[in-house]
């Protein structure tokens, strides 16, 4: 699982404000194909790992996969049937906060139809709606702007 090596504060506040669209990480930079989120939400480290395994399994370990998000926000939970008070709960998992337009995964070294199917299967593992994009389609879209 992905998680930060070291944090300044062990149990910070929950990520709340997920308004607006992604400014950073919104273009396909490394590969030729990408998976872009269409809505805001949290993606856990387990969901990222599940999607990564799905992609690598479908492309039969051919090509290269880039994970463009990192789960850096800890989410705490208290044990079940615990009374109120007695401090904040322990860290249960880490999430990446996603805004619409954020590139989640990139893929290179495989044909477009294989990449599209692999990223479609990966999108089914994620809690946000996603779409398939290519580097060429993004360049055309940015010039029209």
UniProtKB/Swiss-Prot annotation:
Pfam family, one: Ribosomal_L16
Keyword Transcription belongs to the record: no
InterPro entries: Ribosomal_uL16 (IPR047873), Ribosomal_uL16_bact-type (IPR000114), Ribosomal_uL16_CS (IPR020798), Ribosomal_uL16_dom (IPR016180), Ribosomal_uL16_sf (IPR036920)
GO molecular function terms listed in the Swiss-Prot or TrEMBL record: rRNA binding; structural constituent of ribosome; tRNA binding
GO cellular component: a single term: cytosolic large ribosomal subunit
Family named by the database record: Belongs to the universal ribosomal protein uL16 family.
NCBIfam families noted in UniProt: rplP_bact
Subunit structure: Part of the 50S ribosomal subunit.
Name used for this protein in its record: Large ribosomal subunit protein uL16
Organism of provenance: Herpetosiphon aurantiacus (strain ATCC 23779 / DSM 785 / 114-95)
Upper lineage: Bacteria, Bacillati, Chloroflexota, Chloroflexia, Herpetosiphonales
Name of encoding gene: rplP
């Amino acid at each position: 699982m992905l998680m930060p090596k070291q944090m300044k504060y062990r149990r910070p506040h929950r990520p709340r404000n997920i308004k607006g669209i992604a400014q950073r990480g919104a273009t396909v930079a490394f590969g030729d194909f990408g998976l872009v989120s269409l809505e805001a939400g949290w993606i856990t480290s387990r969901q990222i790992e599940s999607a990564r395994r799905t992609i690598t399994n479908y492309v039969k370990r051919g090509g290269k996969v880039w994970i463009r998000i990192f789960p850096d926000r800890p989410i705490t939970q208290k044990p079940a049937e615990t009374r109120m008070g007695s401090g904040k709960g322990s860290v249960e998992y880490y999430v990446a906060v996603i805004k619409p337009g954020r590139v989640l995964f990139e893929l290179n070294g495989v044909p477009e139809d294989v990449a599209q199917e692999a990223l479609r299967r990966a999108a089914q593992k994620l809690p946000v709606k996603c779409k398939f994009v290519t580097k060429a389609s993004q360049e055309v879209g940015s010039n029209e702007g």
